[in-house]
Amino acid sequence: MTGYEDPRLEKMFLPNDKGDYVGIRIGIDVTSKSQAQAKYSNMIVTSSTPYLWINAAEVAFLKAEYELRWGTKDAAKALYEQAIRLSFEDKGAKDADAYIADKTRKPAAYNDPLGNYSATALSSITIAWEDDSAEGADKAAIKERNLERIITQKWIAIFPLGVEAWSEHRRTGYPKLLPVPTDKSGGTVDVCLLYTSPSPRD
């Protein structure tokens, strides 16, 4: 979200002790709770925050994906843009139209404030919908990039539904996530949760 200079960021997270927005990379070793609270951003979620089951933006993103795969390109684009506007409205953020039109901003590199787990971004996907009508355009590649746009923006819009976000990634491979520093899965994302040993049945 920082690479996109996303106006929703400040509505969803608190800055760290330096005023920056920095998430904790999955699978890193943070040994001190106080250090984590100071150096990384925290979610703006309290005990009175309503539980999100599904929001209007997610519905529009689902429709956009359907239209991209089996419907019309114009409908997919319109629904993608509507979904982002709905997400901005839901989060109380402004300037959705400028955000939707942005053709240059891309995901930022991850700069770990502790200095141990920084990494370059794995995706260069921009926000604005990509048109495939130009002569000689690689329609299949553009369709795949637009799918990445839909799922990346959907990932942002459905926060803080972690299980749902995990399911979207398993299903589509998007958004492109940094691998955990200690990779015990061979570079793949788990498709089920394993019981501990001994299992509850033992």
Can you annotate each of these PLM segments?
Residues 94, 101, 168-169, 184-187:
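Residue-level signal for alpha-helical context at structural boundaries
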Residues 175:
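Extracellular glycan-recognition regions
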Residues 1-63, 69, 76-140, 144-153, ...:
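Hydrophobic-face positions in mid-chain alpha helices that act as interaction patches
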Residues 156-171:
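Bilobed periplasmic-binding protein-like "clamshell/Venus-flytrap" ligand-binding domains
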Residues 195-202:
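Conserved small/polar residues in nucleotide/adenosyl-binding loops
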Residues 129, 184-194:
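Short, intrinsically disordered, charge-balanced linker/junction segments flanking boundaries
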